Amino acid sequence: MDIQTRIKELRKQINEANYLYHTKDQPIISDFVYDGLMRELIELETKYPEYDDETSPTKKIGGVVLDAFKKHTHTVPMMSLSNIFNKEELKVFYDRIQKVIPNTSFTTELKIDGLAVTLIYEKGIFKKAATRGNGVVGEDITENVKTIKTLPLQLSKPLDIEVRGEIYMSHKTFKEVNLERANSNLDLFVNPRNAAAGTVRQLDSKVVAKRRLDLFTYTVVGASNFNSTQKETLEFLSELGFPVNPHYKLVDNLDALSDAIDNYDILRKTLPYDTDGVVIKVNQFEHYETIGYTAKYPKYAGAYKFEAEKQITKVEDIIFQVGRTGVITPVAVLTPVFISGSLVSRATLHNEDYILNKDIRIDDQVLVHKAGEIIPEVIEVVLGSRTNQAPFEMVKHCPACESNLVRKQGEADYYCANDNCPGKNVFGLIHFASRAAMDIDTLGEKVVELLHDQTYLQTIPDIYKLHTFKDQLEELPGFGKKKVEKLLNAIEASKMQTLDRLIFGLGIKNVGAKVAKTLLNHYPSITLLADAKYEDLIQIPDIGPEIADSVTTYFSNESNQHMLEELKNLGLQMTYKIDVVTTHPFNGKTFVVTGTLDDFSRTEASDIIEKLGGKVSGSVSKKTDYVLAGKEAGSKLTKALELGIEVMDEATFKVKINE
């Protein structure tokens, strides 16, 4: 057998093994044999580059390292589906469609909890993959998606086709990846979806390949050009070699639809991957235009959302955390329980009133869920299992410094009033260094906690004295010369941050980033702001009595005055200047910023627009000139497209601001 024939034979064997193992769950060769075939193919392709082929399974190994992701404009927007939250809403959805198209049938498909992706093929050869992004513009993640073993690099037919699907990470892989990260002292991923999203955004495709992402496809762009129904489309995708979730069904009445959802709710708890609902679509494509669309969603489809998962567990203890403003938050320490894709061992109890209203006690059995599928929360006590648990009593002293706690009239929270409280200081230091405030790279939560424990950081000015401990810092666990140098450079650079960031970073109660700017627009230096009178502050638009009281209280405190003087002497900016560029193309233009941007927060983008003479509004109207849209942009983007307003993605924004 000649070399070229052997290479083709190896590719065929490996592709067949990949398909049967990853798509059909039917392994035909052992891992040992598979690895041997792959090694042989890699060696032959390396030795004989003239036989290189972009569809070779060796392309899934990874190896391309990118500087950044390129933007990709979708030929057809990747928009969302409307949510259906209960059986009553399901009936409304069903009846509305039946009025337009009587006796229509529906497909039901599991909604995979992952990352949406579009896949582009030319003459049956995989060419490009892109994320959803803001629905109009996504990111090119081709090299990373190539590493997914269930992705066909060559289809069974030479078609020009665009296919959409969901990238996800299995429970097994998720546990393995987090174990590796724990052993490397890295932050753990919160859940498989978070892990999949983080992996897809890796610039090094070798890292992606090691994390073993997976894929399900569910539709074709312009599907009616290939088939007449959604069911046929799913079968068609499978025939082409795409992985398709096998648990789809065809139903023809409301009872069958309701039963299917109930069955999916049972099934999903046994699956090796996460799901977060059921996608329901009218089966016949010919009815889509008749049924129509809203401004944001197609009317012929919806996503039934499973009720938030709840679990019963035990309250082992109630502890108290000190926030950066001194707020004392009670937290339930729970017997660990798996909820919605992650292990939950703590849950917020909000405040004393919340605990007393629900009568939560240590040793109680409680029902826990994730609020918004994110934040663990105790929702009720299982009273039938209670024995002799003592009623909850709020602590009277700060858990960090033992100072007396205070509760202001009309407020639910208790506060530690000690300005030098170490617990408050840790959170205050973390906030000060955060991206939204002074943006000190490398000085994250864990580093702050370590330096605080080692007594290098107790106050904000201590941050700017860390250079005097350079040699000692290099000896700390997880540090070293390069990391310390990077940290100290970031600290030095932060001295040039604008005064509004400093004011926000100080953690003054009720003073967020926007309020800080508003205050400085009227008192453009630390001295002027410190001398501002309560009665003058409340005359400023958007500055009410609570903010005015917080500001005057903060600046009248002698310890705070000394700290600010120290920061001034250390070289931080103490005056505020807005340089409005009246000749810039943004001058006089009204913007709306929506979605999540990669390199800016929405506040940062708004700051740039305003400094270039533009105005930032909170809502889209006919008076809006531009909508700056990031990922997961929702109704504001939809309205902009309806009104014909120019939509600007982040890449264009970066170019424009330098004009």
UniProtKB/Swiss-Prot annotation:
SUPFAM superfamilies: BRCT domain, DNA ligase/mRNA capping enzyme, catalytic domain, Nucleic acid-binding proteins, RuvA domain 2-like. Residues 581-659 form the BRCT domain. InterPro entries: BRCT_dom, BRCT_dom_sf, DisA/LigA_HHH, DNA_ligase, DNA_ligase_AS, DNA_ligase_CS, DNAligase_adenylation, DNAligase_N. It comes from the Bacteria. Zn(2+) binds at residues 398, 401, 416, 421. One of its GO terms (molecular function) is metal ion binding. Disulfide bonds: none annotated. GO terms for cellular component: cytosol. Belongs to the NAD-dependent DNA ligase family. LigA subfamily. The active site is at residue 111. Keywords: DNA damage, DNA repair, DNA replication, Ligase, Magnesium, Manganese, Metal-binding, NAD, Zinc. This is DNA ligase. NAD(+) binds at residues 31-35, 80-81, 109, 132, 166, 281, 305. Its EC number is 6.5.1.2.
